[in-house]
Amino acid sequence: GFPAVRIMETNENYTQQHQDIRIEDGIAYGDTIEHVNFDYAAKLTSLNAVVLAGMAKAPAPPANVEIRGAVRPSTTLSWDKILGAASYRVHWRLTTSPTWDYSRAVGDVDSFTLENVVIDNYFFGVSSVAEDGSQSPVVFPGPAGSFD
């Protein structure tokens, strides 16, 4: 397969989207031009283009990310370096958080230990960073996080 990105609206108005044009019980249904907010669509298209361009020029994600730290007070991540990456960033977040709340630039290395960050309390990942600062997606340790 190929890496892919899906850009979507999560708060859809189902009377105006995914409907055949009709009036039912006094409600007008359907995708019609009067419901399009062109200023918003233009801003969203510009934002999407910038984000996708940044993703396209970013280096590939690190490969073979591994984690160690069971029954230790610190957590160590290791990975294979990627051609085109100038450095790497280690990310972690509480297991209840949907976003990467913490990260640390770790340089052009292939492993890093987060001192006094216990493996049991967080999710961890690593991203590759290009010379210009563009960054790959974060990769979780283990086979499930691999793009290979």
What are these regions (language model features)?
Residues 1-148:
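Secretory-pathway/membrane protein signature
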